[in-house]
Structures are given as C-alpha cells and as structure tokens.
Amino acid sequence: MFDERLARIARGHSRDMATRRFFSHTNPDGEDATARGKRAEFTCRKPISTSSYREGLGENLYQDNLYSRIHFSGTERSYDWNSSDKLAANSLRAWMNSPGHRHNILDKVYSQTGIGIAISNDDKVFITQMFC
C-alpha cells in the first residue's frame, strides 16, 4: 500500500542525492534508510514470527538520465527525452533483474511503500523506493 510518509522520506533522499551528487543507500552524513526514517519520526517494525520481529526500512535506488541520446550537428544539439513512462519502466526492469531489489519488491513482510523522484541540475533522475 502507498504511504505518503515513506514517499516524503524517499523524495528527501532523492533530492539529497541530486543536490549533493552522490548515489548510495547511505548519505554523506552516514545515515541509511532506517536512520533517515527515524529522523522523520517513522519507524518500521514487522513481525516475522510469533517470537521475533524485523526493524528497519527497505530501500531500492535507481539513477537514469532525462534523455536517452544527444544528437550533435555542428554547434546545435538536440535530445531524445525519456518519458516518465520510460523512466518508470527502466527503473522497474532494473530492480526486477537485481535479486536484492526484486526481493524488496516481492517480500511479503513489507506492506507499505513510497517512491520519491528528484532531478539534478545535470539532468540525472534519482528514484528512491522505500518499504516498511
């Protein structure tokens, strides 16, 4: 189920990556997904059996460009822009072809998700998907 709080945390991480020019589950301040969630007063605790639980957020990251190709003709340049549908399809394909990312998407313990997208000044697209 979509969760707006997770989406806000995900957007914040995507914006942070776009602004500070990094691509990682851990930001330059040393915060991982769970720490960023706690800073936003969001904790995730899921039972995995009658006597144990799992605490923490899951996270998938994806980076792409706004364009798929640049054409140069003399001093002119033009772009083949990626549509939002194309960017969504690219991210999902990449995640589903990666065992760890695929596991996050299909893990039945997670019941909430949020996605955040940011675009950097140099046309990079950062997508963060978070799970609880």
Predicted regions located by residue number:
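Conserved "HGTGT" condensation-loop signature of ketosynthase/thiolase-family condensing enzymes
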Residues: 22-24
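A generic structural-conservation signal
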Residues: 1-2, 26, 46, 114
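Acidic helix-start/capping segments at beta-turn-to-alpha-helix junctions
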Residues: 1-18, 28-36
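Generic secondary-structure boundary/loop-capping signal
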Residues: 14, 20, 58-59, 102, ...
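Short, low-complexity, Pro/Ser/Thr/Gly-rich segments in the mature regions of secreted, periplasmic
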Residues: 122-132
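A well-ordered secondary-structure block
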Residues: 33-122
